[in-house]
Amino acid sequence: MDIRMIATDMDGTLLDAQGQFDNNRFEKILDQLEERHIKFVVATGNEIGRMRKLFGQDLMERMTFVVANGARVFEGNSLLAEQHWDKALVQDVLAYFAGKERDYHLVANLHDGAYALEGMTFPMVEKFMTQEMAKE
């Protein structure tokens, strides 16, 4: 059986505890995967903007990204597919969680980033992200 694709999560998997990776080593690994015609896919709850900051333009163009927990798929920097909730469903969800946003750590994920109520904390996320990354 041939391996055609390798997919990985980011935080706590590809990235170390400081939210970083060895860029030179990773580029060599990508070279080897490309020689074998194996696609490398990043699957993450993060948005594409964070991926651009982490990988830079050159590496971005060599990978596929499934971001925002599957809401968008990019081949390099090109959007291939996007799925979103319709307005009525968003209104229903917001109404259901009204007043309980902090209890459930409600986050709205949009094209330009993720949004939560000011002052909300995310203890599990903070284990894998630095404060600077969480604020971006």
For the regions a protein language model found, what residue spans apply to each?
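Metal-dependent catalytic neighborhoods of phosphoester/phosphodiester hydrolases
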Residues: 50-60
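Asp-based phosphoryl-transfer active-site loop
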Residues: 2-19
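Short glycine-/acidic-enriched loop or helix-start segments at secondary-structure transitions
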Residues: 17-18, 51-53, 76-77, 118
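Short, small/acidic-rich helices and loops at N termini and domain boundaries
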Residues: 64-67
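Substrate-recognition element of Asp-dependent hydrolases with the DxDx(T/V) motif
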Residues: 30-52, 69, 106-110
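Catalytic-core regions built around general acid/base machinery
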Residues: 24-37, 92, 96
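HAD-like small-molecule phosphatases
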Residues: 71-136
